[in-house]
Amino acid sequence: MSVTTSTTEFSVGQNVSFDRRGPVRWVASHAWRNWPQAAMGILGALGNAAMAAVVPILVGQAYNLVMSSQPSIRDLLWIAVWIAVSQVLRGVFQFVRNFGFEWIAQRVERDVRNELYVNLLGKSMTFHSLQPVGDTMARATNDVREVNFLFSPGLNLVIGSLNFLFVPLFAAPSYHPSLILTPLLFVLSYIVALWRYLESLKPVTDEVRAAFGQLNTRLSEALDGVETVKGAAQEAAEVLRFGKNAQRYRNAAVLQGQMEARYLPLLLFNIALGVGLFHALVLFRQGILDGGQVIAYFGLLLLLDFPTFISLFAYSQISLGLAGARRILELMNRENNLDQNLAGFHPSMQGAIEFRDVSFHYGDNGHALSELSFRVQPGQTVAIVGQTGSGKTTLTKLVNRTYDATLGSVLVDGRDVRQWNLEALRRNISIIEQDIFLFS
């Protein structure tokens, strides 16, 4: 299985790796690991659709039997028995389908959560220092849960309903070859309409997940930094910021609802139902079909209602799940330039520190430190004084490679810290920080 690999600051041995080249490939690689549960769900879906088709066919036969000159009560009873048996079997198949997809959904959620957690352990301290905690928590909890919902009820209902689309295609021609026309045209138009619906829904669901992440990020920061907020009398400003983020999330959710309200397949189904019934009645008037066959054919067309109605919810859930998977992958695949450097320098540390023309900046912002040079001898005590935001903490974090210098070199015992084994470097450095909080 092809995977995306990267350097890590910390690694945990894993026996299983997954394809991270895209959200669909990634989700599929997780599903493939649980193929027995997927096969169980698909088998249950096929059996459920087959048993659902039995009822209209038997009802049509019962109608012809009742309308005959000498109806047989015994035959009617046998039809009733077969209907009852088929629906009991259908219930069993539904249970197998639901159990299989719920099983795979829970296992995939477990594996995704574990994969994300191990990946976050391997991220550098630079990453965790700059990445908002609230956004990480939103991806690690709610987005992972959306991947669960992608399988159940998402794929559970989609795969279960797709079989209902094809049952009329196979059963209708047995009454008359021309009767395949209506369900065939409906299926083709349904696929086109559904494709356009999903394409238009993708950016909306991405915005829903992104807005939720931003809302969660700001809320987490406000709660963690509540002392700072109250100390600066910024309660009203924080309420305003939270209100704007909540409004953004609300607008995205409303837009998703508006797009779902314009779901075209519901209209196409009702048109197909009317056209199909009219076609069957024309054949009945011509003596080609009998009353029981008309009833059976109309019952087969009614099977199209399930995939049409359920896809309104199910495909939205799949789109949300893929949006969540996309956000999780973006977090896991984010570049990490800091490596453990297992083969690096790791002698006993003496404690000499030297900064040579060191400059550092956060992302695309201006330099936090610029062309800084000084030396500290072993045993020497140095006090660094400056106002908040002047770069004091940043300077100390360059020594243990929480950050790497943008320009210049930081040396410990005469060697660039990049040449040191990371564990050996940090094991010999102690840092005690004051209780501070800076908003992102």
What are these language model-derived features?
Residues 1-53, 67-79, 97-101, 105, ...:
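Membrane-integrated ABC transporters
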Residues 114, 119, 129-134, 207-255, ...:
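Loop segments that connect adjacent transmembrane helices in multi-pass transporters
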Residues 211, 231-234, 267, 304-331:
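Cytosolic ends of transmembrane helices, especially the final helix of ABC transmembrane type-1 domains
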Residues 38-93, 173-178, 287-291:
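Transmembrane helix-loop-helix hairpins at lipid-water interfaces of multipass membrane proteins
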Residues 23, 31-34, 97, 101, ...:
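Juxtamembrane loop-to-helix connectors within ABC transporter transmembrane domains
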Residues 340, 348-440:
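ABC-type nucleotide-binding domain
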Residues 54-61, 89, 155-198, 254-296, ...:
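A hydrophobic transmembrane-helix motif
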